[in-house]
């Protein structure tokens, strides 16, 4: 299983903080928020991670490096324009190949990490057979979902 972190957004809702830097590098408890995602992927046993970057790609590359501090191998995947989540996966198709992957939004913070979700997905995939369990989506209720996007399934 591989990891795919989307880190291309500009962070307009975090301005003025993001006028001078990547929103994924805004610190939470003195740690860039992106670093929590990288650690969560590593904790879940994922070693190969692709990071889709936008305008702040060089800043993110400078902060993350090769990923070795988390025991990861990081590949950077530039996205020329913010064309959505599906486009980011399209850009990453050569990196992902035919492997299962976790897509993690680089500005999200999950308090308890993702290990239990990855384990649950693997267990369901094994029990149901590869063709029957092909996706798992994590969503959280928010008071004003229109500000963030509404999932339709």
Model-identified regions with their sequence ranges:
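Conserved N-terminal catalytic core of the sugar/cofactor nucleotidyltransferase
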Residues: 2-5, 13-16, 26-27, 31-105, ...
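Active-site glycine-centered loops adjacent to acidic/histidine catalytic or metal-binding residues
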Residues: 9, 107, 141
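A generic "binding-loop/recognition-motif" signal
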Residues: 10, 21, 56
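Short beta-strand-to-loop element that shapes/binds the nucleotide-sugar donor at the catalytic cleft/hinge
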Residues: 134-153
């Amino acid at each position: 299983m591989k990891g795919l972190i989307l880190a291309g957004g500009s962070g307009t809702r975090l301005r003025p903080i993001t006028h001078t830097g990547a929103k994924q590098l805004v610190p939470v408890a003195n740690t860039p928020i992106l670093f929590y995602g990288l650690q969560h992927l590593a904790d879940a046993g994922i070693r190969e991670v692709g990071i889709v970057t936008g305008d702040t790609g060089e800043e993110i590359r400078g902060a993350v490096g090769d990923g070795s501090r988390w025991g990861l191998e990081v590949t950077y995947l530039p996205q020329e324009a913010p064309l959505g989540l599906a486009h980011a996966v399209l850009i990453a198709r050569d990196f992902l190949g035919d492997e299962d992957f976790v897509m993690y939004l680089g500005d999200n913070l999950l308090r308890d990490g993702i290990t239990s979700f990855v384990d649950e997905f693997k267990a369901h995939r094994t029990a149901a057979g590869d063709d029957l369990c092909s996706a798992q989506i994590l969503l959280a209720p928010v008071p004003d979902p229109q500000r963030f996007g509404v999932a339709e399934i």
